[in-house]
C-alpha cells in the first residue's frame, strides 16, 4: 500500500498545472470581455474593477475613471453602434500579473450601412485570483 502512495506522489509533478477553483485565466477574461462587448454590457465589461483608463472617443485618456463613470462612458460609446462581429485576435501575459487582450470589432452606426472596423486593446491586472480590466483603448 505504501508503495502505491509513493508512486502516486512521484507522478504528481508530471500532471499539468490547472487553475485553482475560482481562479480565472487571461483567456477567461478575454472570453468574458468579448461577450460583454458583443452585448454592449458595460457593467460586465468593467466587472469588479475600481478604476479604468478609457481611451475611446468621448473620454479624457489622461486619468483613470471610477467604476460608475467608466460604465456610463462605455454605455454612451456603445449606444449608436450595431455590432456585426467581434473577434479576439491576441491574448498575452506580458509579465506576471499583467496582460492584454486585443479584439477586432466590426460594426455599423445605427441608421447607416457603412461597415466600420476598430481594434480594441484591453489591459488587465491579476488581482487575487481574477484578471481585472484596468485600461481600454480604441484604435481605428
Language model regions located:
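Short, low-complexity N-terminal intrinsically disordered segments enriched in polar/charged residues
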Residues: 2-4, 9-12, 18-39, 47, ...
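Residue-level signal for cytosolic alpha-helical hairpin/rod architecture
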Residues: 27-31, 56, 85
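A short, structured loop/turn motif at beta-sheet edges
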Residues: 40, 91-98, 124-130
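Short, well-ordered alpha-helical segments enriched in acidic and aromatic residues
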Residues: 41-53
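A short gly/proline-enriched turn/hairpin at secondary-structure junctions
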Residues: 54-64
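Solvent-exposed loop/turn segments at secondary-structure junctions
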Residues: 61, 107-109, 139-140
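Surface-exposed, charged secondary-structure patches
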Residues: 69-112
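Short beta-strand edge/turn micro-motifs at domain boundaries
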Residues: 114-140
